[in-house]
Design a protein with these regions (language model features):
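N-terminal Sec signal peptide and the immediately downstream disordered periplasmic leader
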Residues: 1-67, 73-77, 188-189, 226-228, ...
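Short, glycine-/polar-rich solvent-exposed loops and beta-turns at beta-strand/coil boundaries
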Residues: 31-33, 81-92, 114, 121-122, ...
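Hydrophobic, lipid-facing positions within transmembrane beta-strands of outer-membrane proteins
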Residues: 36, 94, 155, 169, ...
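Short acidic/polar hinge/loop motifs at secondary-structure boundaries
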Residues: 113-141
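Periplasmic-side early beta-strands and strand-to-turn transitions of outer-membrane beta-barrels
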Residues: 158, 166-167, 174, 186-267
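Residue-level signature of outer-membrane beta-barrel architecture
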Residues: 100, 161, 189, 234-236, ...
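Extracytoplasmic beta-strand/coil segments of soluble accessory domains associated
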Residues: 73, 77-113, 135
């Protein structure tokens, strides 16, 4: 008989933030939420969400940060159009699909780069994706195969990372049951010339729980993940260019065919992304 587990309940959290300003005040609620955000997924160019001729929803950075462990599955399942099927607790494989479609018909992007696997089985597991540098998640609901190909028949989920706007650094730590912990560190540099740089790292580890109840107590669904992201760029009124790298790797224990012994899976994903644009006029951006 198999058991169903919910994601680990957090029992403690610490956060230390260091920035240019010694005191940080909460923004007024009316300013914290952007009522008409700028999106790029629908037409591959920046436009207001209200002007997009398609159904699209946006998850803001504030909503992402409400999940202390920055788990993509937990963030996405708040949207009614997203179906999440998780095979156990933290770090176990998760299927993601849009509006009742097949997993392989939902496209996952980060800054325009595809994160779907090459075998047509759909996006890489959301558990293996680092959200520490993500500022916005756009969910395009409905067929988008004309823009993105056959694996976007159900829709597109895109993770957007924006450029840093001020110099500063932060350190965050989270601890929970089953010896679960996650640490994140990030540092940004911005100067008046338009140059900027950002670097961050994260580590998550948990002992997990037994996947099925016939297993020995020592056979647990452990998960170990670490990664980093770095970005440099230059931006002014005419030119915008950047080079970014995102590396994520680790191991997770899982069970196959309800056997009594767990197997170990190693995972690694690396994303290198170069972007450049030139504003030729007020109406033309190349």
């Amino acid at each position: 008989m198999s058991k169903s587990f919910q994601p680990t309940r957090l029992v403690g959290a610490i956060a230390i933030a260091m920035g240019c300003s010694p005191v940080i005040f909460a923004e007024d609620a009316t300013n914290a939420t952007q009522l008409d955000p700028i999106v790029i997924t629908a037409s591959k160019s920046a436009e207001k969400a209200s002007e997009v001729p398609a159904r699209i929803s946006v998850i803001s950075k504030e909503e992402i940060e409400k999940n202390p462990v920055l788990n993509l599955s937990d963030v996405l399942q708040k949207d009614a159009s997203i179906y999440i099927k998780q095979s156990g607790g933290v770090g176990q494989l998760t299927d993601l699909s849009l509006r009742g479609g097949q997993t392989g018909s939902t496209l996952l992007l980060k800054n325009g780069a595809r994160l779907n696997t090459q075998n047509g089985l759909g996006p890489v597991s959301p558990e293996f994706i680092n959200l520490s540098d993500v500022d916005q998640i756009e969910i395009l609901k409905g067929p988008a195969s004309v823009q993105y190909g056959s694996d976007a028949i159900s829709g597109v989920v895109q993770l957007i990372s924006n450029n840093p706007t001020k110099s500063g650094a932060s350190l965050t730590g989270v601890y929970g049951e089953n010896r679960t912990y996650k640490t994140l560190v990030n540092a940004d540099y911005v100067d008046d010339s338009g140059f900027y740089a950002s670097i961050g790292g994260q580590r998550m580890e948990t002992d997990g729980t037994s996947i099925i109840n016939i297993q020995d107590k020592s056979e647990k669904a452990a998960f170990d993940q670490k990664g980093y992201n770095a970005k440099i760029g230059y931006s002014n009124d005419v030119i915008n260019t950047s080079l970014a790298i995102d590396q994520n790797q680790g191991t997770n224990n899982y069970t196959t065919n309800y056997s009594t012994n767990n197997a170990k899976r190693n995972f690694e994903n690396r994303l290198v992304n170069w972007l450049a644009s030139y504003k030729a006029s007020s109406d033309l951006v190349l």
